[in-house]
Curated annotation (Swiss-Prot):
Name used for this protein in its record: 4-diphosphocytidyl-2-C-methyl-D-erythritol kinase
Pfam short name (any one): GHMP_kinases_C
Keyword Cell inner membrane listed: no
Active site, UniProt feature: K14, D139
Lineage of the species this protein comes from: Bacteria, Pseudomonadati, Pseudomonadota, Gammaproteobacteria, Alteromonadales
Catalysed reactions, as listed in the record: 4-CDP-2-C-methyl-D-erythritol + ATP = 4-CDP-2-C-methyl-D-erythritol 2-phosphate + ADP + H(+)
Family: Belongs to the GHMP kinase family. IspE subfamily.
Pathway entry: Isoprenoid biosynthesis; isopentenyl diphosphate biosynthesis via DXP pathway; isopentenyl diphosphate from 1-deoxy-D-xylulose 5-phosphate: step 3/6
EC number(s) reported in the record: 2.7.1.148
Length: 284
């Protein structure tokens, strides 16, 4: 199977089942604790090996300049780090909203690093890829390692956990929230004590939520609407909100009644990232 020159790979969504901010470091980064779960839904990336050194990114790039695109940055980083002479053509089918808090850009970057590590035969370990990925964003390492986990520190210290499978209806209220704006805002809660004891009692708490609701009333409106069905929560710094169910039918019922001004999808949680599952099926 070592002669594979093209394949496609999912870049899955993530949800933060809780997000606590414990403090702000001198370098501006925040100490946090958050529980990540992956979903079996996401962007789709197609990779085609090229003998020319160029990295070409096509598809749903939303007008982002190539040099600012995290997919391009990830490919260039690995190519430069490992002195690769080959190039690649990458096509993106975008399903995850930008500025939604479901990890779209970070997931795209991680899946690119994982895929090209195979395609270019660079043979880096997951730890080495995660170290590279951290240069692209604090959430990239969790997508590289690809396991449900509690993240500590600035998000780079991962404690693997096993979560029961759940179904989610995730709603994007067509509002883009800037992560940088939230984390630099003076009103952000930054003093939550670190978890001691059972982390499961902290499920569905998010220190960013009250501030985002204040700055983006549509998020509060979304959370209130979802409350008709189940306890609702915001993921990351928003703007996506979600509700959790035991069955697909329950999640589908929410999606079927979604106001036409919003977008949404349903998906089940998985303890191993679909990107890892698909790569194993292709290369192992």
């Amino acid at each position: 199977m070592n002669n594979i020159t093209s394949f496609s790979l999912i870049a899955p969504a993530k949800l933060n089942l809780f997000l606590h901010i414990n403090g702000r470091r001198d370098d501006g980064y925040h100490e946090l604790e958050t529980l990540f779960t992956f979903l079996n839904y996401g962007d789709e990336l197609s990779f085609e090996l090229s003998d020319l050194p160029a990295i070409i990114v096509t598809g749903d790039t939303n007008g982002i300049a190539t040099t600012d695109n995290l997919i391009y940055k990830a490919a260039l980083l690995l190519q430069t780090q490992c002195k690769i002479k080959q190039g690649v053509k990458i096509n993106l089918i975008k399903r995850l909203p930008m500025g939604g808090g479901v990890g779209g850009g970070s997931s795209d970057a991680a899946s690119t690093l994982l895929a090209l590590n195979k395609l270019w035969k660079t043979a880096l370990s997951l730890d080495e890829l995660a170290h590279l990925g951290l240069q692209l964003g604090a959430d990239v390492p969790v997508f590289i390692h690809g396991k449900s986990a509690i993240a500590h520190g600035i998000g780079e210290q991962l404690e693997q956990v096993m979560l029961e499978q759940k179904w989610y209806c995730v709603v994007f209220p067509n509002q883009h929230v800037s992560t940088a704006k939230i984390f630099t805002h003076p009103e952000l809660k930054r003093d939550t004590p670190k978890i001691s004891g059972d982390w499961q009692q902290h499920i569905l708490t998010n220190d960013c939520e009250s501030l985002v609701k204040k700055l983006c009333p549509e998020v509060e409106k979304t959370l209130q609407w979802l409350l008709k069905y189940a306890p609702s929560k915001m993921t990351g710094t928003g703007s996506c909100c979600f509700v959790e169910f035991a069955t697909q039918v329950q999640a589908q019922d929410v999606l079927a009644n979604l106001p036409h001004t919003w977008q949404g999808f349903i998906a089940s949680s998985v303890n191993t990232s679909p990107a890892h599952t698909e790569l194993a099926a292709i290369f192992d």
